[in-house]
Amino acid sequence: MVHAFVPPHLLDFAEYIQNQEYSAEHYDLQCIDRTIVNRAYLSTYLHVQEWILNNGPYNDVKDYCEHDIGYHAAICIALNELNKKAMSKKYAEFIELRVDAHYNIVTIITPKDAQKALDLAFQIQNALQ
């Protein structure tokens, strides 16, 4: 019997665990890959935010937006405004990868995803020197 106060996302997670046959080693490796994606993203987020504030006319990344949106989406808009459209697209791709790694527990994160995160971090940070 399911308790009335169990959030639906926890039930989804429990069902997911029941349907998987993970070994301890596989789970540990996926945790490492998720950590790599998250740390690569967050270091890039801080680097890009600092670059925008140093190279743009505003004192806050959100000043580039007409509507109240989060900082992560605001960074994409700010990069577009500062003529860094290619980096804006890469950053948006990085956001999607980070969301999958950090919030979507049913998404399998592989070493290939971790390497992609490192590549995106390297490309974006080097382009904004």
Language model segments and positions:
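Terminal alpha-helical segments
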Residues: 1-129
